[in-house]
Amino acid sequence: MNNNMNHLMNPSADPIAASASSPRDNPCFDIDPTVATLIVFADDEHSYMLPYAQFLYAELIPNPVLETQREAPPEKLTIRFVAAEVEMFGSGFRSIVRALQKYELKFVKSAGRRYAALLKTHIATVAITLTKETP
């Protein structure tokens, strides 16, 4: 047996489709118990690295626009840091909250709506607001 091949290759041509069966392969987020920061890939094509040392709180609520927009994502997650507030809309956010609670959430980013049915955790949108320091 060849000891150099200790892992299986993913034969799926579509990594998003493979993610439905494995939460570790979800393109919307990843978990790493050794991280000290959360990387946020915002929908404006900017990325931000936020230190867990500045984490304040997270709030998971039903999406308030569901009453007027039935096609809207069902959940809203707000992650507040000292200098930034991250807002995400999507579904299945409990796994993200659990990873955040342990400071193991490595990154978050959105994936197209067409993947929502394939993923247990789907992030439809990610926005960040940076807090300006007052001189």
Where is each model-derived feature located?
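Short, surface-exposed polybasic-and-hydrophobic patches located at secondary-structure transitions
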Residues: 65-95
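Short gly/pro-enriched beta-turn/loop segments at secondary-structure junctions
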Residues: 33-35, 72
